[in-house]
């Protein structure tokens, strides 16, 4: 009897083994959020709660994605209906991310198009003045423009990696992914440098709050996307993507996510940096 894994399943339905990771990831996220709130309010043991939350989320996500990769590469469970369902799931996930950023942009436009004076003395905003007169904003054609060029170039390199993957060119795929990762890390370093030299703090008013929430949330997505691409680069070197019809979803989703990050930054650069200045 041949006990090797078949190349396809005997059916096309999306039936996978029961997994503990969705519910465990939910609890880990709850701990992470609780740790973040505790850290902001300087509660007792806040550092330990936050660290435990970060480690728990990282471990759960690693284990969950490891099992998904095993289902596709070893168990050959990713039939066409399964891949179609996973693509829909990723598209819906990106849609929820768009909603997140939509809220930030709505807050920014509400504050910038109709700035009003607050009487409690917390924020200094004068009627019809944006940015607030006490805020020294960034020059949009300094570091923000460099970051725009970096992300546009990274979008080109990840597309190059995609074409190399389609042509079964492992060397070019790994090279292009490596360049994209370097550009992503460079973007994060430039963003950190910009934050370090900012002339305002998060608590200095409505403008800094909107600025740091929008750009910081995007920066977190760049870091997540970079990690996503690093995993894909290791998998490409290992030859996972050479398995026809089963090993491409991870890279495909990473490319979608990275292009989404690129597009969001173009909106941030246009409205928050140029219009907002």
Swiss-Prot record:
It is a multi-pass membrane protein. Gene3D superfamilies: 1.10.287.70, Cytochrome c oxidase, subunit III, four-helix bundle. The keyword tRNA processing does not apply. Its main location: membrane. Keywords: Cell membrane, Membrane, Translocase, Transmembrane, Transmembrane helix. Its EC number is 7.1.1.9. GO terms for cellular component: plasma membrane. This is Probable cytochrome c oxidase subunit 3.
